[in-house]
């Protein structure tokens, strides 16, 4: 939506290797509308955030977050949607020219399977109050993230 609404702005999106499979149709949207989105898939070869919850609440008893989990070859997935693909194993693999590229690019960012996912929402907290917590004034959220009514030019 952001890339369609603000074509004059660069859009960079981050998602996980599990999440992209739940919303894979968005790759067709990128291709169909020729959106120059830079999509970074954080690939820890499992449902990392669920694994963290299993560590926190179930003493690390994992079910379907490592063993029993598999994923497709994301290079082939990107090719199926006719998107450029980059496998990122270190910071040296990211080129400034990739970010300036006018096309959409699927970046497969390879992470260690035990990489912690942060920021994260603690149980019972709203979306804008994620861990690690930021030391912000009480009105910072409203001033920063909630647009004024009928104010397209300010967005």
Question: What is the meaning of each model-derived region?
Answer:
Residues 1-155:
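Thiamine diphosphate
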